[in-house]
From Swiss-Prot:
Pfam families: C2-set_3 (PF22705), V-set (PF07686). Interacts with CTLA4 (in vitro). One of its GO terms (molecular function) is receptor ligand activity. This is ICOS ligand. It is found in: Cell membrane. Expressed on peripheral blood B-cells and monocytes, as well as on monocyte-derived dendritic cells (at protein level). Glycans are attached at residues 70, 137, 173, 186, 225. It is linked to Immunodeficiency 119: An autosomal recessive immunologic disorder characterized by childhood-onset of recurrent respiratory tract infections, susceptibility to chronic DNA-based viral infections, hypogammaglobulinemia, and panlymphopenia. Residues 19-256 are extracellular. Residues 1-18 form the signal peptide. Residues 278-302 are cytoplasmic. Residues 141-227 form the Ig-like C2-type domain. Ligand for the T-cell-specific cell surface receptor ICOS. Acts as a costimulatory signal for T-cell proliferation and cytokine secretion. Also induces B-cell proliferation and differentiation into plasma cells. Could play an important role in mediating local tissue responses to inflammatory conditions, as well as in modulating the secondary immune response by co-stimulating memory T-cell function. In endothelial cells, required for proper neutrophil transmigration in response to chemoattractants, such as CXCL8/IL8 or N-formyl-methionyl peptides (fMLP).
């Protein structure tokens, strides 16, 4: 096997795992993140002497690597091709950190960085294991208005989507901020097409005259709690109705006819005024036939 082949480097990598530094980093879905793997400041390296290898710790997936005189990255897994890069300028200074672009939920795992020196007989120069934690904000919970499948029970539904990691769901009695018994709720949590979590929680409680509860979606990694309340009163079951002033039907009809009568009277008055004005205008402007025909002068014959 050639000295500069990826296969040889993989064999060396599998046998050199002692004295590994451990680090943790957190990234949001869709963001870029740097996985640190660097020697002390002031270090200098020759890129024709060092071998650098990044892979996932558990599945041994090849993320990226640097081999002297070999620019091919054909062994890089397709999931990381064009997404995982090292800086040649940084490597000259001993910074072998990995830049990972467009983080996905599937990137949540441990990554191992190994640096070897050929001039030192492939001695390990640096070994770092970085645990990447991935997070995404859940949407603000939507709590449906309660409905009554029976006279003795109320049902609430709470929905939140596109979060990571898997959430915790709590229902809260907002009167005293106590947690409701989780036996009263039924949670459905599943991964959507984006690899993020959607959650639907259904709460069933005994019907009471007044209920003030809240649904809480907890993202442990982000230390984030999103809570939305839902309050009902004695008018449960009448929430879709609009309450008006108690005016009788007869009173409404009488008021309607009164308005119509006034409108009709106004129309009649307006028409009468119009006709009167028209007649007056005609009388003032008409001067008779003498006004429009010049007076004929009679001249007698001598």
């Amino acid at each position: 096997m050639r000295l500069g082949s990826p296969g040889l480097l993989f064999l060396l990598f599998s046998s050199l795992r002692a004295d590994t530094q451990e680090k943790e980093v957190r990234a949001m879905v869709g963001s870029d993140v740097e996985l640190s793997c660097a020697c002390p400041e002031g270090s200098r390296f020759d890129l024709n002497d060092v071998y650098v290898y990044w892979q996932t710790s558990e599945s041994k997936t090849v993320v990226t690597y640097h081999i002297p005189q070999n620019s091919s990255l054909e062994n890089v897994d397709s999931r990381y091709r064009n997404r995982a890069l090292m800086s040649p300028a940084g490597m000259l200074r001993g910074d072998f950190s990995l830049r990972l672009f467009n983080v996905t939920p599937q990137d949540e795992q441990k990554f191992h960085c190994l640096v070897l020196s050929q001039s030192l007989g492939f001695q390990e120069v640096l070994s770092v294991e970085v645990t990447l934690h991935v997070a995404a904000n859940f949407s603000v919970p939507v709590v449906s208005a309660p409905h009554s499948p029976s006279q003795d029970e109320l049902t609430f539904t709470c929905t939140s989507i596109n979060g990571y990691p898997r959430p915790n769901v709590y229902w809260i009695n907002k009167t005293d901020n106590s947690l409701l018994d989780q036996a009263l709720q039924n949670d459905t949590v599943f991964l959507n097409m984006r690899g993020l979590y959607d959650v639907v929680s259904v709460l069933r409680i005994a019907r009471t005259p007044s209920v003030n509860i809240g649904c809480c979606i907890e993202n442990v990694l982000l230390q984030q709690n999103l809570t939305v309340g839902s309050q009902t009163g004695n008018d449960i079951g009448e929430r879709d109705k609009i309450t008006e002033n108690p005016v009788s039907t007869g009173e409404k009809n009488a008021a309607t006819w009164s308005i119509l009568a006034v409108l009709c009277l106004l129309v009649v008055v307006a028409v009468a005024i119009g006709w009167v004005c028209r007649d007056r205008c005609l009388q003032h402007s008409y001067a008779g036939a003498w006004a429009v025909s010049p007076e004929t002068e009679l001249t007698g014959h001598v």
